Amino acid sequence: MKLLHHAFCPHSRFARLALAEYRASFDLADEDVRKRRPEFLELNPAGTTPVLLDGKFPVSGASVIAEYIDETHGTNLGEHRLLPADPKARAEVRRIAGWFHDKFYVEVSEPLVREKILKLRLSSAEGGGPPDSSALQAAKKNIRYHLQYVGWLLSTRSWLAAEKLSFADLAAAAHLSVADYLGDVPWDESENAKNWYAKMKSRPSFRPLLADLVPGLPPSKVYADLDF
C-alpha cells in the first residue's frame, strides 16, 4: 500500500499512526495538494490528503482510511482493535476523533500549520509572507480549552474515549503533534493531557512522526522528548 500525504497535515499523521498501529505495510509519498495534479484529483476529486492506495484502489480521507484498515487488518490486533465492537463505544470513539478532525483542525491545527509552515514555501503571489498574528493568537487561545477538554476526559477514563487505546487517541495526538512541533501547546496547564501525550509519543507508531522536520524551522525543544 502507498499513502499519499503531507508530513505536517494532521489528518495524514492520523492515517500514518493508524496504519502503523495495525502493523500494515505501506510506503509514503509526499503530495503537494496546491499543485492539483490531475492524477491525484482522479484518486480524490476533493484534492485533499491523505489518500491510501491499496493496489490501484484509492481510499480517501483520514477516518475512512482508519476504518478501512480496521476492517482489512483488524485480525492483527484482535481484541485490541482501535474501533470497539460495541456500537455505543464506537460512537464515542468517532465523536472524539471527529472533534479533533473537525473542530480542533479548524480552530487550532490548520491555522498554525498554514501560518507557520505552509507560508514558508509560498511566494507573496501565492499567499506567502509573514504569519497572520491575529490567526496565530486565536489558535493559541483556542488550544487552551481543547487541552482542558482532553484533561477532563482523562479524569473520567484511562484513554480519551474508553479504557483502552482507540482511534480517538490517535486523532488527538496527530493534531496536537503539529502544534507541539511548533511549540504552541501549553502542557503545563493540564497534567492529565501531558501524561497521556507522553504515553502516545512513546508508542513505536509515533517514532516516524517525531523524525519529521520542516526545512528551516526546527522543532520545539520538547517535540521529540519522551520525558518532557
What are the residue ranges of the model-derived segments?
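GST-like domain detector, emphasizing the conserved glutathione-binding G-site
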Residues: 1-133, 227
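Residue-level detector of family-conserved "landmark" positions at structurally sensitive sites
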Residues: 29, 62, 189-190, 210-211
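Positions that flank functional sites
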Residues: 34, 165, 215-216
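Short, flexible helix/strand-to-coil boundary loops that buttress conserved ligand/catalytic motifs
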Residues: 44, 63, 108, 154, ...
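Short, hydrophobic secondary-structure boundary micro-motifs
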Residues: 78-85, 107-108, 160-163, 188, ...
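GST-like fold's C-terminal all-alpha helical module
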Residues: 100-202
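Acidic/histidine-enriched, glycine/proline-rich intrinsically disordered or flexible terminal extensions
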Residues: 213-228
